């Protein structure tokens, strides 16, 4: 029972870190990155489909992304989705592929993005701590119901605290890495 609760907690915390990693990867740095388009979705024959499934995305230069749709009919729809997104880039369409020049970020914009990264990191830490709180409540219930001994439950609480601390540190490292990427000129 206790092991199950701890295992579930670790699994959920890992998922929270994974979501944080994905959220942070969506924050645009000054460099071109194919991942910046992973959340863009277009209407493809009636169903919402990510651009990454409709085109190959390559980065031939540090500040240039080339998108080549598998289906040439979708060229305009992909271009429109990129233009209407919050990425702050302007795609150019040459009839067969889309070139996206990634402009250099201003110092002010870098600072905004660092704040955004810290906010996403804080959200992830809050979700990890909420997972910890729920498992602690479960452990207290187990102790109260007499399903496990006092020593077992307190050992499990210490393990849970250690696990929580490890995942919070992982999130801090992700945010610090992203901050370094953003502030690098």
Curated annotation (Swiss-Prot):
Main location (coarse class): cytoplasm
GO cellular component: cytoplasm
Domain of life: Bacteria
Record-level GO BP terms: translational termination
Keywords of this entry: Cytoplasm, Protein biosynthesis
Keyword Ribosomal protein carried by entry: no
A Pfam family assignment: RRF
Cellular localization per UniProt: Cytoplasm
GO molecular-function term, one example from the UniProt record: ribosomal large subunit binding
Homology family: Belongs to the RRF family.
UniProt function note: Responsible for the release of ribosomes from messenger RNA at the termination of protein biosynthesis. May increase the efficiency of translation by recycling ribosomes from one round of translation to another.
Protein name from the UniProt record: Ribosome-recycling factor
Organism, as annotated: Mycobacterium leprae (strain TN)
Taxonomic lineage of the native organism: Bacteria, Bacillati, Actinomycetota, Actinomycetes, Mycobacteriales
